[in-house]
Amino acid sequence: MNHIKDQIRCGAAYRLGLTGKGIGVAVLDTGIFLHRDFDSRVTGFADMVNGKNFAYDDCGHGTHICGIIGGSGRMSGGRYSGIAPGCDLVMVKVLDRKGNGYSSDVLAGISWILERKEKLGIRILNISVGACSKRGMSENSALVKGVNRAWDAGLVVVVAAGNNGPRTMSITTPGISRKVITVGCSDDDREVLVGGNRMVDYSGRGPTAACICKPDLVAPGCSVVSCSSRADKYTIKSGTSMSTPIVSGAVALLLERFPDCLLYTSPSPRDMRRS
């Protein structure tokens, strides 16, 4: 994680003392293991898959995502700390132990978050989840309407572009929404999977069926080390799923520095990118 933070120049934010403190980041994923890197900052959990009332992750994907966003790095001496190590984390489990799920559970998760966003201080919604069925590729799909509703309610919604590249029109739903920040995967100058400094081949590409340019941003996502769901260890994963929480963490730092910057306007993804 340290080389990724260098790549995206987190040092400037850290020199200002920014850690994402006080910013709630909600995550729709496979759940969360209470790794010691999260300290006591997991402030909410809901399970739309199995209905359990305690935090768990039977896949590992969600825990890895949360570590990238806000792990403290406590168990690695700070080496694998997340982008916003002081932020609060809210997990809604919408995917099963194999990483599969239903759009109805994702929509239920979005509704759960919107009902509690004030109470839990949620400002950001991270969705490293996508559907690639042709029926879901319309801007009128339920998933797109769901993330648009979250954006209109004041959340910064950050969504993975998916791993169906390099062909065009391969952005997964709900990343095709013109409102949300859709994130692709770059190789961050390291010779992993592909060489050179460019979007990796598997990263989803636009335009969308509605001719919207996507992704809005790319971020490092190759061989990212983050929290494991097995004990207090770490593991390596790659994909746009890993790039997306890097952007979510960066937004948390931005909102800590400028907490009112989104209260009176509805910025486009382009506005957030410029910030």
Give the label of every model feature segment.
Residues 14-26, 32-44, 52-104, 120-123, ...:
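Subtilisin-like serine protease catalytic core
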Residues 29, 175-256:
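Extracellular S/T/G-rich loop segment that most often corresponds to the catalytic His/Ser-adjacent loop
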Residues 31-33, 130-132, 162-166, 188, ...:
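Catalytic metal-binding/acid-base residues of hydrolase active sites
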Residues 90, 156-158, 182-183, 225:
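Structural detector of well-ordered beta-strand residues that form the stable sheet scaffold
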Residues 64-68, 108, 245-253:
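Short amphipathic alpha-helical face segments that pack within enzyme cores
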Residues 1-24, 37, 136, 193, ...:
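Protease zymogen maturation seam
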Residues 264-275:
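Single conserved hydrophobic/aromatic residue that forms the stacking wall/gate
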Residues 94-179, 209-212, 230-238, 242-243:
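Substrate-binding/access-modulating region of protease and related hydrolase catalytic domains
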